[in-house]
Regions:
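Short N-terminal signal/transit or membrane-insertion segments
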Residues: 20, 24, 32, 98-103, ...
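Intrinsically disordered, low-complexity sequence elements enriched in Ser/Thr/Gly/Pro
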Residues: 14-15, 63, 334
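Bacterial extracytoplasmic/cell-wall-associated proteins, especially those involved in peptidoglycan
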Residues: 59, 123, 136, 140-143, ...
Length: 345
């Protein structure tokens, strides 16, 4: 039979052979188009939205089964065929994917193999404490329990990895806007913020070659300056004031370190608050508090490394948020009468 077909083929003219190949190509093209249209086209018009959760180690067959069960694809076999023929059967990435029924088979494969996972964005303002960061993450539903974040922020392995001479990462979680996948773990968030901290720190020349303890002191100072100074231009001056107080063995007398003792900052500290027995009370104790009291931004960190020397020894906040700096205690008391006592009388 085949020999007869071969004889017929040999006797065909070159034009007839060409027509045969053109016809065969057209037939294959239309068959492929029909199969793709019938089996690979989108199921719906986008009204149905589904979150596909792919866990680590999930095989492609389980993923395909979930897609067919939720009516996101037309053919299980065709989807598997495309995965294999395109070499993507082992390239499916873990994550949470937002899919809808307007995506065709090829588009769905592209989404789950390129890692176009569902993301969420959160912003940590400069000067937020770890407690406040946990609150932001909880409100954004990134974490289900603040304790999970605290455990990650106090994880000894992470602290050791980044050479932080403390039992917490307070002060080293860089305040910024972050975009993360929905399934990010607290440990991943903490490490991401730590990496951002050290990346920004590297832009400050004076930070190089410091020991962890020396850096820690700078971050403590920066964290206090961050909470005290609302105006960025005042931060270097304020850093200089605190360093001058340290030099003459005077207490730092920072209200911000006392505010750190409360879960939520008070609008105004009372005299009794300044008498709270705590190593963080810099009215009662000389020197730095045990650790950072906030997570400072780059301007405050820079101010700690590049303080401005001056004759100022005191300061107080004015109604507009700026500070009045004084050289003497007498001048400071006069400013207090002008700005503070009038404000609260």
């Amino acid at each position: 039979m085949f020999s007869e077909i071969w004889k017929i083929w040999k006797n065909l003219s070159i034009w007839k052979k060409l027509i045969f190949f053109i016809g065969l190509f057209v037939l294959v093209f239309f068959m492929s188009f029909f199969v793709d249209y019938a089996l690979g086209r989108a199921v719906g018009d986008g009204k149905f939205v589904y979150e596909l959760h792919i866990q680590p180690g999930t095989g492609y067959k389980k993923v395909v089964k979930e897609l067919i069960e939720n009516k996101l694809i037309r053919s299980e076999l065709y989807f598997q065929f495309l995965l294999k023929i395109t070499g993507n059967s082992n390239k499916i990435k873990q994550g949470i994917y937002t899919l809808n029924d307007s995506l065709n088979t090829a588009q769905i494969i592209n989404v789950i193999t390129t890692g176009k996972v569902k993301t969420i964005t959160f912003t940590i303002p400069e000067g937020y404490t770890n407690r406040q960061i946990a609150e932001v993450l909880l409100n954004k539903k990134i974490i289900s329990d603040k304790k999970n974040f605290f455990d990650a922020a106090e994880n000894p392995e992470i602290i050791k990895k980044y050479n932080i001479p403390a039992n917490t990462t307070e002060g080293y979680l860089f305040p910024e806007t972050y975009t993360i996948p929905y399934n990010y773990k607290p440990e991943q968030i903490v490490e991401m913020m730590l990496k951002r901290f050290f990346k920004n720190l590297a832009t400050i020349e004076e930070s190089k070659n410091l020991t962890p303890s020396e850096l820690h002191e700078k971050i403590i100072l920066a964290s206090i300056v961050e909470r005290e100074a609302k105006k960025k231009e005042e931060q270097p001056i304020m850093a200089g004031v605190f360093l001058k107080r340290l030099k003459i063995k005077m207490p730092l007398e920072s209200c911000a370190t006392v505010q750190y003792l409360f879960d939520k900052p008070k609008s105004r500290l009372l005299e009794k608050d300044l008498e709270i027995a705590s190593p963080y009370n810099t009215y009662l104790n000389k020197g730095y508090p045990p650790g950072p009291i906030s997570n400072p931004g780059l301007p405050a960190i820079t101010a700690a490394f590049r303080p401005v020397e001056s004759d100022y020894l005191f300061f107080l906040v004015k109604p507009d948020g700026s500070h009045y700096f004084s050289k003497t205690h007498t001048e400071h008391l006069e400013a207090k009468k002008k700005y503070i006592d009038v404000l609260y009388e």
